[in-house]
Amino acid sequence: MYTNYMSWQKKLFFGLLGGVILVVLLIVAVAKFGQKKEPITITYWGLWEPEEVIKPLIAEFETVHPDIKVNYVFQSQREYRERLQNALSQGRGPDVFRIHNTWLPMFKSELSPVPFTEFESIYPPVVSYDFRLGSNYMAVPLMYDGLALYTNDELFDQGGKTIPTSWEELRKTAVELSVCDSVDGRCTRGDKILISGAAMGTADNVDHWQDVLGIIMMQNNVNLSLPQGQSAEESLQYYTIFNRADHVWDSTLPSSTSMFAAGKLAMYFAPSWRVFEIKETNPKLKFSVHPLPQLPLDISRGEKPTTWATYWAEGVSKKSQNTTAAWEWVKFLSSKESLTKMYQTASGIREFGEIYPRIDMQASLINAPYVGPVVSQVANARSWYLTGFTFDGPTGINTKISNYFADAINSINQGRQPSEVTKTLSAGVNQVLSQYGLATQLAAPAN
């Protein structure tokens, strides 16, 4: 009987002990479960889009992801690339940031690979090419832009001209639409230019001259990494002929954007974002936007038009402590729904929003004023490190390469032999590219 009593007491003790332990565990679990998790904050450096365009998307994202907060910091383009790289190198940079499509060589060591699949089926070939690094993609675009031909409607109507579709037509039209302060109004002797037919030929006052020369060379099958040989020489001669022989453009004139906005320039090359500046400067100016002229194409040989892309994309810092959350934000922004909302909001404060980068959305803009011609060129677009207005600063890849091409333009205008000019140009370009592991072995020109 005593033994049974002791056994009963032991069972009671362990039962009570087990109950206490269970209660304690339940209390701890409930306390832990009920404890509010501190949200993650990701910092997003943006360009071009004001806070009022991004804020509604942040609110929507944070509703769906209550554990993630987004801090949007609108950046000035001035010294942006240097400021961004310095911050990233010092470990105090943003989680998400915007880079130009030509900046991958400068940022490849700072970027976290895109974790999404089906990249190539969503974006046009130029995007896949620009941001591919090995087997990975390194940034996701929320917009697209490219070089287009702007024309002054009134000058074309007065001259009875049609929009040129080839470079030879463009040159002929430029000469015929130009007006100089001469006896007969023609511009054959270098008289003061009153109305210019086309802004081409110089490197100091033609906005986006890099893009214009770049596309002329690409269409002429010039290897921009090794710009020498007959095709490169011909391209430089064609670009400069508007200054040195046709006298329809010179360095005494204001910038091409200012001339076009003033109604004194018939043809002008620029991306779509220049529409905003032109409209603001001269709301009454009647102008149109068109696809780029092309060199003659042999369709039977499979030759296709070549156009020029210049756009921006979102990357995630490799040093971010919250790469998963950062990519979740970029994935949300790059969805069809978010891009549509962003475009609509932006269109409420300016002429139009940023052009959709996704293949499955571009058809909706193909007939839109100003942007339609840019969209129509996406499939055949290419790009390179000879791009204007990337704001990459004096040590940026575009600026350094542009300096060598500007010297080449000036040398041709001063009468130097094209073969000597391109030899110097190739050496300079090669020197810049070698800093990024992109140099091409210098050799005798193939043509």
Question: What do the predicted segments below correspond to?
Answer:
Residues 1-43, 430-447:
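Short, low-complexity disordered leader/linker segments with a strong preference
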Residues 38-49, 68-73, 95-96, 138, ...:
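Short, well-ordered beta-strand elements
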Residues 49-69, 401, 405:
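Short, polar/charged alpha-helical segment
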Residues 60-126, 130-132, 154-165, 266-267, ...:
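Extracytoplasmic "Venus flytrap"/periplasmic binding protein-like
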Residues 64, 69-71, 137, 158, ...:
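Extracytoplasmic/periplasmic substrate-recognition and gating elements
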Residues 99-148, 171, 187-197, 209-212, ...:
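Hinge/lid segment of periplasmic solute-binding proteins
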Residues 174-175, 222-253, 292-295:
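Glycine-centered hinge/linker elements that transmit conformational signals in sensory
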Residues 368-430:
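C-terminal capping/gating helix-and-loop segments adjacent to ligand/active sites or protein-protein/ligand interfaces
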